[in-house]
């Protein structure tokens, strides 16, 4: 019984929280046209990151965001060639700053089936 309680209440690690956020935005998100601004590669705490910096506009407000796509190998392999290209961005209509350029089931880069 105690083990079941632990599993239910254990803290999710940051990678799992980010995965859940991506899937949530994918489920309820609206699509807007965007542009890939840059790719920033780095390493923190022993893990590599691949940040795709992108911009998009919602209701006259321009947003610039970054998403680490290192957990999405198919996307991470292709983004180095996409700076300056247009892309689709999914954003949360209640919080337009909460957005994704790709997730496990969708890509605004045309690399996965929509």
Question: What function would you assign to each model-found segment?
Answer:
Residues 2-114:
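Oxidizing extracytosolic/periplasmic lumen-facing domains
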């Amino acid at each position: 019984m105690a083990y079941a309680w632990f599993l239910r209440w254990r803290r999710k690690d940051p990678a799992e929280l980010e995965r859940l956020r991506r899937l949530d935005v994918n489920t309820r998100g609206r699509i807007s046209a965007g542009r890939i601004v840059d790719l920033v590669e780095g390493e923190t705490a022993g893990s590599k990151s691949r940040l795709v910096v992108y911009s998009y506009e919602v209701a006259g407000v321009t947003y610039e965001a970054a998403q680490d796509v290192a957990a999405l190998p198919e996307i991470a392999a292709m983004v180095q060639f996409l700076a300056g290209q247009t892309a689709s961005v999914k954003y949360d209509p209640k919080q337009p700053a909460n957005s994704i350029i790709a997730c496990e089931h969708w890509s605004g880069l045309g690399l996965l089936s929509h």
